[in-house]
Amino acid sequence: MTDPDSSGFRRTVELSSGQRVTLRSVEPGDRDAVADGYRQLSTSAAFERFHTLKPELARATLDFLTEVDHRDHEAIGAVDPAFSRGVGIARYIRSEAEPTRAEVAVVVLDDWQGLGLGRRLLEAVRDRARDEDVTCLTAEVMSDNERMLGLLRAMGPVSLDRSGSETTAHLPI
């Protein structure tokens, strides 16, 4: 994901390391950058986010991940301005059955983890969801993904429903 002038959401944030990144709306032109970012993920990071392993994301998946309407499906990407490359993405997808609920997901490149970027991305996508009348975010998380579960707990009161290897988190916003 490069840093072109895209429409919609844009914010610069500082991470715990002092590094600054630009958070902005994901657009269809980010397709190649999202594919490249997926290839840069470690096996464990890719599995924790997608719950499966694939060598490449399919064209239809890339289209789905980048062609968002910014209302029922929002995606916010983090861009490292020093290198104009994407380093993380958070998104929500509104539930058709329960329009005030949306599923949320976050992925951060391995070398950017532990700097507070996941939290900044989750805060941004939470704020966008709230702007669109979503009142609860849900997340399907691998039960042993303590980093993501900890991030969700840090965002506020969260209820967790564990079922085997997956946990569903419910975060009122």
Regions found by a protein language model. Name each.
Residues 1-173:
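Long, contiguous binding/interaction regions
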